[in-house]
């Protein structure tokens, strides 16, 4: 392991520990006995992440996983025809922040407002250690009145006609995520000439990590299919939904045999046909996750 890798690993570890300590202090200040089920679940999710065998360099965020599925291995860029991945990555950010206990939806109220009309509010402003996530979290925290999930996906993507809200756009997201993957040893950086201009590309350098990611997605809808989204790992469930919304899920299924492919797509369709409004009412669900799903499937 190089000294650079060691330094980056230590930095990530220190950031993660600092974030967890800050979040724990804030929860303690709010009253330990009154902590919600979501708080407990978010702590379990973070602990599960820490317990996984992968090194810090190869533990990927939802955004990085979706981008990795969309990148061409040798060329090092996403398809020029993919106009879905931009909004999909913003949806990943909202879910990632929710899974880390930073965001939640406002209470549904007596009249039970729908997922798409409920506002996103900041639950904790403790740093995540990820620059993009912290940037998005800062926007959510400082915005009054709050916005809905659908609005945040559009605002963070820059898809607004209101010039006063253009500052919400997160710029160069794909390039910044690719650089994160370069630092984690998954991609490398090259310059390619495209007739009239040069373009920075990020070809795959660690195929094992991508193959593990593809295998994880395939197994979720084949060998390890449980036919119940609430028994699936939340992060994996979100990955399947967001990979589909970003139009990159097909890349994970491309190597499958015809029968496996048909079964996998059938089961993904089962997930897409679920009603997020119904699913979010079940026990131990993450409402932001289902609100993002609703934004992309309604």
Curated annotation (Swiss-Prot):
Phosphatidylinositol-4-phosphate-binding protein that links Golgi membranes to the cytoskeleton and may participate in the tensile force required for vesicle budding from the Golgi. Thereby, may play a role in Golgi membrane trafficking and could indirectly give its flattened shape to the Golgi apparatus. May also bind to the coatomer to regulate Golgi membrane trafficking. May play a role in anterograde transport from the Golgi to the plasma membrane and regulate secretion. Induction: Activated by depletion of mitochondrial DNA. A 1,2-diacyl-sn-glycero-3-phospho-(1D-myo-inositol 4-phosphate) binds at residues 81, 90, 171, 174. This is Golgi phosphoprotein 3. One of its GO terms (biological process) is asymmetric Golgi ribbon formation. Disulfide bonds join 84-108. GO terms for molecular function: cargo adaptor activity; enzyme binding; phosphatidylinositol-4-phosphate binding. Phosphorylated. PANTHER family: GOLGI PHOSPHOPROTEIN 3, TRANS-GOLGI PROTEIN GMX33. InterPro entries: GPP34-like, GPP34-like_sf. Changing residue 81 to A: Abolishes phosphoinositide binding and localization to the Golgi apparatus. Its main location: Golgi. Changing residue 174 to A: Abolishes phosphoinositide binding and localization to the Golgi apparatus. Changing residue 90 to A: Abolishes phosphoinositide binding and localization to the Golgi apparatus. Transmembrane segments: none annotated. Residues 14-28 have a biased composition (Basic and acidic residues). Changing residue 90 to L: Loss of function in vesicle budding, abolishes phosphoinositide binding and localization to the Golgi apparatus. Residues 1-57 are annotated as: Disordered. Keywords: Cell membrane, Disulfide bond, Endosome, Golgi apparatus, Lipid-binding, Membrane, Mitochondrion, Phosphoprotein, Protein transport, Transport. It comes from Homo sapiens.
């Amino acid at each position: 392991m190089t000294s650079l890798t060691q330094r980056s690993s230590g930095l990530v570890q220190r950031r993660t520990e600092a974030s967890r300590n800050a979040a724990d202090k804030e929860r303690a200040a709010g009253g330990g006995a009154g902590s919600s089920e979501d708080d407990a679940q978010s702590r379990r999710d973070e602990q599960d992440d820490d317990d996984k065998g992968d090194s810090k360099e190869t533990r990927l965020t939802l955004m990085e996983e979706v981008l990795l599925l969309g990148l061409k291995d040798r060329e090092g860029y996403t398809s020029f025809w993919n106009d879905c991945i931009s909004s999909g990555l913003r949806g990943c950010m909202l879910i990632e922040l929710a899974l880390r206990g930073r965001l939640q939806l406002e209470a549904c109220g007596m009249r039970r407002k729908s997922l798409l009309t409920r506002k996103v509010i900041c639950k904790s402003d403790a740093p995540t250690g990820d620059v993009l996530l912290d940037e998005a979290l800062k926007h959510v925290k400082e915005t009054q009145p709050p916005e809905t999930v659908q609005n945040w996906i559009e605002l963070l993507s820059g898809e607004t006609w209101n010039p006063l809200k253009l500052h919400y756009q997160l710029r160069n997201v794909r390039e910044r995520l690719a650089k994160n993957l370069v630092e984690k040893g998954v991609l490398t950086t090259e310059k390619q000439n495209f007739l009239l201009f040069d373009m920075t590309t990020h070809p795959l350098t660690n195929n094992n990590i991508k193959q593990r990611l593809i295998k994880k997605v395939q197994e979720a809808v084949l060998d390890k299919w449980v036919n119940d989204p609430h028994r699936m790992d939340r992060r994996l469930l979100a990955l399947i939904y967001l990979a589909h919304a970003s139009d990159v899920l097909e890349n994970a299924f491309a190597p499958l045999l015809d029968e496996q492919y048909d079964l996998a797509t059938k089961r993904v369709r089962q997930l897409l046909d679920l009603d997020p409004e119904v699913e979010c009412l079940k026990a131990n669900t993450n409402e932001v996750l289902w609100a993002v799903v609703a934004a992309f499937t309604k």
